[in-house]
Amino acid sequence: MDRSIMPIDSPARDKPPDELVWPLRLFLILLGYSTVATPAAILIYYVRRNRHAFETPYLSIRLLLRSFAVGNPEYQLIPTGEKQARKENDSIPQTRAQCINVIILLLFFFSGIQVTLVAMGVLQERIITRGYRRSDQLEVEDKFGETQFLIFCNRIVALVLSLMILAKDWTKQPPHVPPLYVHSYTSFSNTISSWCQYEALKYVSFPTQTICKASKVVVTMLMGRLVRGQRYSWFEYGCGCTIAFGASLFLLSSSSKGAGSTITYTSFSGMILMAGYLLFDAFTLNWQKALFDTKPKVSKYQMMFGVNFFSAILCAVSLIEQGTLWSSIKFGAEHVDFSRDVFLLSLSGAIGQIFIYSTIERFGPIVFAVIMTIRQMLSIVLSTIMYGHELTFLAAIGFMIVFAAIFVDIHKKYSDKSRGPQRSW
């Protein structure tokens, strides 16, 4: 039986996983990635050593290799104009009208992220948990079990969508100053972060998962100091810790806290994996913001294309080495409605990326981390309302703590705006 196909009645394995398995799996993944990274590193070294031989005004393979390994540093001297300078300084609105516009924009991004992620969750659950009928035997159903193929399809659709947008507005795009390979860092960290997150679910209890995910804001701030040299005041760190505490209190006290979690222990492996998830996720957000801050900045569609290009390569290499790429394609060809669901899942993910990159570009990684925390809380609130569950007193206190911390931070930024430009989360 193909590895991408699971019997419809396959039982779940409840016994604790072997803690020696995940390091081996991670090693094999990194070994597979090295088959791409090593030749790429050699190519980058060669082009950088002979960069003058690759300088040409014409579109050719030499120009593409130069853009990949060296970038276009000569465009860094181009004046970016008052419009961009003004945009970098308007993160804190100075008037009530600007404040309303920023709030509307933030709510629009939040709604877009919420809708696309909910759609992805529904479609992914449909694909993974339910069987698909064979086109030649309608009474036979098979489950699809290769989640990495779904990620690969998501990257391909996002790659095509970003390429179409770039082709349409090519003349409006800023010069891409950094070398193209810098997007591979985002792809790698995002891939490893997702892997650590899913792998950690086998080793950590629900309370540990909750506290770690709620701490994402603080970890993102610390990583911002390391990656971008962004300085935060003790007051801002205090607000971040307060948000983490309030979110943890809410999520741990909500009536749905036991849903989807059967692990009652937390092992050392689980803590390592959760730490890996938080660190790589925080690096991803801050590295993207660092690229957005280049002058002229990288556009969100350039970012989207570069990240998905390298992510698609990494996923393809992994699928080929595991022997599941062709079996997954064969599954789609042989089963009714599977290709449709995968396309809708991938399209939802691609549109969601546009909202995510727009949020990071406009408001920064900290705001995005806060949005994801609030999104998780609102999902529980909506579930509580829809199914008639009761929201506990401690959960309500945690909910109020989170929004009080956000309000206090915003109020302080407005109070201090007369002292000069302030940092924005």
From Swiss-Prot:
Entry keywords, A to Z: Golgi apparatus, Membrane, Transmembrane, Transmembrane helix, Transport
GO BP, sorted A to Z: 3'-phosphoadenosine 5'-phosphosulfate transport; transmembrane transport
Recorded GO CC terms: endoplasmic reticulum membrane; Golgi apparatus; Golgi cisterna membrane; Golgi membrane
Record field: transmembrane: 27-47, 102-122, 147-167, 232-252, 263-283, 303-323, 342-360, 365-387, 391-411
Broad class of where this protein is predominantly found: Golgi
Subcellular location: Golgi apparatus membrane
Highest taxon, organism lineage: Eukaryota
Bilayer topology term: Multi-pass membrane protein
UniProt KW rRNA processing keyword: no
InterPro entries assigned to the protein according to its UniProt record, in alphabetical order: SCL35B1-4/HUT1
A Pfam short name: UAA
Gene Ontology terms, MF aspect: 3'-phosphoadenosine 5'-phosphosulfate transmembrane transporter activity
Function according to Swiss-Prot or TrEMBL: Mediates the transport of adenosine 3'-phospho 5'-phosphosulfate (PAPS), from cytosol into Golgi. PAPS is a universal sulfuryl donor for sulfation events that take place in the Golgi.
Family of the protein in this entry: Belongs to the nucleotide-sugar transporter family. SLC35B subfamily.
Protein name: Adenosine 3'-phospho 5'-phosphosulfate transporter 1
